[in-house]
Swiss-Prot record:
Homodimer. One of its GO terms (molecular function) is pyridoxal phosphate binding. SUPFAM superfamilies: PLP-dependent transferases (SSF53383). It comes from Oceanobacillus iheyensis (strain DSM 14371 / CIP 107618 / JCM 11309 / KCTC 3954 / HTE831). Keywords: Cytoplasm, Isomerase, Porphyrin biosynthesis, Pyridoxal phosphate. It holds the Pfam family Aminotran_3. Belongs to the class-III pyridoxal-phosphate-dependent aminotransferase family. HemL subfamily. Its cofactor is pyridoxal 5'-phosphate. This is Glutamate-1-semialdehyde 2,1-aminomutase 2. It comes from the Bacteria.
Length: 428
């Protein structure tokens, strides 16, 4: 495999964009490679500018649950683009997607469309503060909720990959309004509420952490979070930008049967186009302008292209779709474990729906601290070997793999063979 054109493209890109990329994790720094530049994708496959084909487990970092260039989505996008890309006025397409979201997400009675997951979480935080008339927000260490100032505190994802505890440029007077505690730790959460309970506007959390790898909740943890917020008059915000329509047909909240006050969505609901949304109880959502005093707006919010791609994507998913993906995930996870046993590689695997986290450690991974016990050198060796075998994975230990309805049994078989080869070659 050669990557000469990607190397040349990156040399040009570093003079044009900071680090040569528009999102830090794409720089491939933690795996010791230059970025791979892609040009097209179809189904479960993606092709780089050197014409190397890969089985793709990045899927644009999660949105493409139907795979690349799904014919149903592409056809509808072609039709709507010919009619106009944005109007700055309401369209029926917004109603259509809103109805689907409200129907499938247990917590959402009303929804507001925005343009990114970061916009959704920032807006939900403002809404929670305005609704409760409190300032403090509680989040969990290693959880990434976008790059808004109040949420970029002890974040995971790209921040973890780059080894930064937080980001310069976040003022202390903003950071002090964010409390962090370890994920899956009820004792720390209880203590935080004993100290600050009457000042906490909301807990914002990923019901399954996806930006420290993949870390599901312990049994009863989400139920405890729901209980303690209700007990203290705080709101519970589920950041389901990643888990929404990935963990299940009714999102993670449906799977775990825990209903938050507000939910943030993104990724899958845009079918690969820029999108975000936040929604929840009617009495809370009606506090947003123009019906209420809490302001939020967006020039391209609810634009026809994103609404169309989102509607077609969600309309194409059924309960059976998730059963099929989960069966393929089972096979893939078993392949990882068999290879680890055969070549004596320490691994811990977490999964939630079509999300899979692979950690090179003997420890059970239940939070950010235990996620960081993963052997990053092993991960980098494994990653480079998988790329050479035509398997495209997220270039970070702290991101999960994603599967789609387009992945085939043959894709999984080829991937498992590549895993065996990669694990055999790891230098201990």
């Amino acid at each position: 495999m050669t990557l000469n054109q990607s190397i040349d493209a990156y040399k040009e890109a570093v003079d044009l964009m900071p680090g040569g990329v528009n999102s830090p994790v794409r720089a491939f720094k933690s795996v010791g490679m230059n970025p791979i530049f892609m040009k097209e994708g179809k189904g479960s496959k993606i092709v780089d500018i050197d014409n190397n084909e890969y089985i793709d487990y990045v899927l644009s970092w999660g949105p493409l649950i139907l795979g690349h260039s799904d014919e149903r989505v592409v056809k509808k996008l072609q039709d709507i683009t010919a009619k106009g890309t944005s109007f700055g006025a309401p369209t029926l397409l917004e109603n259509d997607l809103a109805k689907l979201v409200i129907d499938r997400v247990p917590s959402i009675e009303m929804v507001r469309m925005v343009n990114s997951g970061t916009e959704a979480t920032m807006s939900a935080i403002r809404l929670a503060r305005g609704y409760t008339d409190r300032d403090l927000i509680l989040k969990f260490e290693g959880s990434y909720h976008g790059h808004g100032d109040s949420l970029l505190i002890k974040a995971g994802s790209g921040v973890a990959t780059l080894g930064l505890p937080d980001s310069p440029g976040v003022p202390e007077n903003i950071a002090k309004n964010t409390i962090t505690v370890p994920y899956n730790d009820t004792d720390s959460l209880k203590l935080a509420f004993e100290n600050y309970g009457d000042r906490i506007a909301a807990i914002i959390m990923e019901p399954v952490c996806g930006n420290m790898g993949v870390v599901p909740p312990k049994d009863g943890f989400l139920q405890y979070v729901r209980h303690i917020t209700e007990e203290n008059g705080s709101l519970l915000i589920f950041d389901e930008v990643m888990t929404g329509f990935r963990v299940g047909y009714h999102c993670a909240q449906g799977h775990y049967d825990v209903t938050p006050d507000l939910t943030c969505l993104g990724k899958v609901i845009g079918g690969g186009l820029p999108v975000g949304a936040y929604g929840g109880k009617r009495e809370i959502m009606e506090q947003i302008a123009p019906t209420g005093p809490i302001y939020q707006a967006g020039t391209l919010s609810g634009n026809p292209l994103a609404m169309t791609a989102g509607y077609e994507t969600l309309s194409s998913l059924s309960e059976e779709s998730y059963e099929d993906i989960n069966n393929k995930v089972d096979t893939l996870v078993n392949g990882f474990r068999d290879a680890a046993d055969k070549f004596d590689i320490p691994i811990h695997i977490n999964r939630a729906g079509s999300m899979v986290g692979v950690f090179f450690t003997d420890e059970e991974v239940i939070n950010f601290e235990t996620a960081q016990t993963s052997n990053l050198d092993y991960f980098a060796q494994y990653y480079r070997s998988m790329v050479n075998e035509g398997i495209f994975l997220p270039p970070s230990q702290f991101e999960g793999l994603f599967l789609s309805t387009a992945h085939t049994d043959d894709d999984i078989e080829k991937t498992v063979k590549a895993i065996h080869k990669a694990f055999e070659q790891i230098e201990k």
